[in-house]
Amino acid sequence: MPPLSESEFLALATRELDRIEAAVEAAADAADADIEISRTGNVMELEFENGSKIIINSQAPMQELWVAARAGGFHFRRDGERWIDTRNGGELYAALSGYVSEQAGASLSFH
């Protein structure tokens, strides 16, 4: 798949962050978990009741979404319609479900 222009990637990343925000809100509501979501540009911060955070941001030069969680730092690259971890091949939403569940202390899943 050919690389996108920077503006194409930023538009794609913004749409994906919108999807992630909606998915986290829906999963948190379903699990009755308190997760504060804030966004500044292409940086999203999820803050949990225990004070821990997950940061998700886009990296246009690398054409990746980066996730920083208690579990570590992860880079996801677009593969068709999915975002895949560049190290272990895991899918973004499956990975986020695990990171968010761990930090929220409740089982949350989203797609």
Swiss-Prot record:
It comes from the Bacteria. Gene3D superfamilies: Frataxin/CyaY. InterPro entries: CyaY, Frataxin/CyaY, Frataxin/CyaY_sf, Frataxin_CS. GO terms for molecular function: ferric iron binding; ferrous iron binding. PROSITE patterns: FRATAXIN_1, FRATAXIN_2. Pfam families: Frataxin_Cyay. GO terms for cellular component: cytosol. One of its GO terms (biological process) is iron-sulfur cluster assembly. Keywords: Iron, Metal-binding. HAMAP family: CyaY. NCBIfam families: FeS_CyaY (TIGR03421). Belongs to the frataxin family. Involved in iron-sulfur (Fe-S) cluster assembly. May act as a regulator of Fe-S biogenesis. This is Iron-sulfur cluster assembly protein CyaY. It comes from Cupriavidus taiwanensis (strain DSM 17343 / BCRC 17206 / CCUG 44338 / CIP 107171 / LMG 19424 / R1) (Ralstonia taiwanensis (strain LMG 19424)).
